[in-house]
Amino acid sequence: VLLDGFIRKFVLCPECENPETELLVSTKRSTISQGCKACGYHSPLESNHKLVTFILKNPPNLNPAVQGSSLTEGKRSKRSKRPNGDTNGDTSQVDDQNESLEASVNENSKNGDDDEGHEWQADVSEEAVRARMQDLTEGAKNMTINDDLEKREKDRMDIFYE
């Protein structure tokens, strides 16, 4: 019940009830407003709640680099380091793969294997269209060209209602 109340007051948008809210802390005015990223609704939060007073007394960091980091991230990084200074996982293998990929890309560009000089558009001349129509299978021809195209518009629309 306590968790449901917290979610309803601080996580869900009061307008659209989506959990897309962002709390905006203004220490100068001693207010916290709630802005929904989904519907754009903005409203101030009740200032008599214990959590609101705690947030106002201890505002979050405004440094964007710190904003996404976890509170336990520092503890994890200390635990995951090995005595010789390496972290968990072998990064040298990944570096070798990246270097080989870059080398192959650079080699292809030096050899002229890039797509410069090619035109990537459909030829719309009558001869090219005729050649493409011949390549179509009989079933596809029946779907694209049939006697229904010669009917009046009203008759073609009546096909859907039959």
UniProtKB/Swiss-Prot annotation:
Region (Disordered): 59-162
UniProt entry tagged with the keyword Nucleotide-binding: yes
Keywords: GTP-binding, Initiation factor, Nucleotide-binding, Protein biosynthesis
Stretches with biased composition (Polar residues): 85-109
GO MF annotations, alphabetized: GTP binding; translation initiation factor activity
Compositional bias (Basic and acidic residues): 148-162
Keyword Electron transport carried by entry: no
A Pfam family matched in the record: eIF-5_eIF-2B
Gene3D superfamilies: 2.20.25.350
Domain of life: Eukaryota
Function field: Catalyzes the hydrolysis of GTP bound to the 40S ribosomal initiation complex (40S.mRNA.Met-tRNA[F].eIF-2.GTP) with the subsequent joining of a 60S ribosomal subunit resulting in the release of eIF-2 and the guanine nucleotide. The subsequent joining of a 60S ribosomal subunit results in the formation of a functional 80S initiation complex (80S.mRNA.Met-tRNA[F]).
Annotated family: Belongs to the eIF-2-beta/eIF-5 family.
Entry protein name: Eukaryotic translation initiation factor 5
Organism in which the protein naturally occurs: Tribolium castaneum (Red flour beetle)
